[in-house]
A protein has these predicted regions:
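N-terminal pre-P-loop "Q-motif" helix
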Residues: 4-19
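Residue-level marker of regulatory loop/turn positions in helix-turn-helix DNA-binding domains and
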Residues: 6, 99, 110, 259-260
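Conserved helicase motor core of P-loop NTPases
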Residues: 16, 137-266
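P-loop (Walker A) phosphate-binding loop of NTP-binding proteins
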Residues: 17, 28, 58, 231
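Conserved helicase motor core of SF1/SF2 NTP-dependent helicases
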Residues: 24, 35, 39, 43, ...
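Conserved glycine(s) of the Walker
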Residues: 32
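A generic structural signal for residues embedded in beta-strands
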Residues: 269-271
């Protein structure tokens, strides 16, 4: 009825969410995690029309994206859902210790959750509730202490479904496929219109080509749809800091008639 055809692993992820009180769904971008979440939500609402569902994510941006992608408007941040970070009055302190009323809790981007926040979260789950943790274990771990998501995956006590078939990608696109190969340590990559390798003899030459390509791309696609990633932070002409400075002078050069504010190494200009 939903018009969805699930792969065998997507079906396994949905079944695990109902067979176990705690389950994990992992996969890189484009492997159908959102489709699985939509299915879990739809099935749960049909089986338990009076059940309470809560979607959570570590950040506001992730929770908004979760709400938009699933069509479920009650997504919130973990801090908000747990009542953390607000005024420490007596009533609020008492409320923080009460179990969450939700019957089904789905947390996205769980790789970003550290030990402290994970402890706060798991201590609030009521008996009988179902919890589904979703994320990409290959992303950078949380800023705070602990690689919680990876430890939960590796503990061997929680059912884990690994989604590895790429769906969210144009038929002719090579980006997601090559990302998967790189992650697996496979150096045999495929090249085409959207995945190109350009060799340079040094960082200065690379920076010059990067800036020229960037200017062409933003002229064609718009500045919000183009991004540069660098493996270097500050060392060399192709580092993030030096590329940012060079691109700023091309895209938004200094104009004496317009206001400029400099705070430390950051420069703020009109436009």
């Amino acid at each position: 009825e939903m018009g969805l055809a699930l792969s065998s692993k997507q079906e396994a992820a949905v079944y695990a969410a109902y067979r176990h009180s705690l389950s994990i769904i992992t996969g890189s971008p484009g492997t159908g995690k959102t489709t699985v979440l939509k299915t879990i939500l739809e099935v749960y609402r049909r089986l338990h029309p009076k059940g309470e569902i809560v979607l959570m994510a570590p950040t506001g941006r992730a929770s908004r994206r979760m709400a938009e992608s699933t069509g479920f408007d009650k997504a919130r941040t973990l801090h908000s859902g747990l009542g953390l970070g607000s005024e420490e009055d007596d009533a609020n302190r008492n409320r923080k210790q009460e179990p969450l009323s939700a019957d089904l809790i789905i947390v996205d981007e769980f790789s970003m959750v550290d030990m402290w926040l994970a402890d706060k979260f798991f201590s609030r789950i009521k008996d009988g509730a179902r919890v589904v943790l979703v994320g990409d274990p290959d992303q950078l771990p949380s800023v705070g202490a602990g690689n919680v998501f990876r430890e939960l995956i590796d503990c061997g006590l929680i059912p884990v479904t690994v989604l590895d078939q790429i769906f969210r990608q144009s038929k002719d696109s090579l980006i997601a496929y090559n990302a998967k190969f790189i992650n697996e340590g496979n150096t045999k990559l495929y090249f085409g219109p959207d995945f190109v390798f350009m060799a340079s003899d040094n960082q200065a030459e690379a920076a010059e080509r990067i800036i020229a390509r960037y200017c062409r791309e933003i002229a064609e696609s718009g500045i919000d749809r183009v991004q540069i990633l660098s493996p270097f932070r500050s060392e060399g002409a192709a580092s993030a800091e030096q590329l940012n400075e060079a691109i700023r002078e091309v895209v938004n050069p200094f104009r004496s008639a317009e206001e400029e504010i400099k705070i430390g190494v950051k420069v703020f200009r009109v436009n």
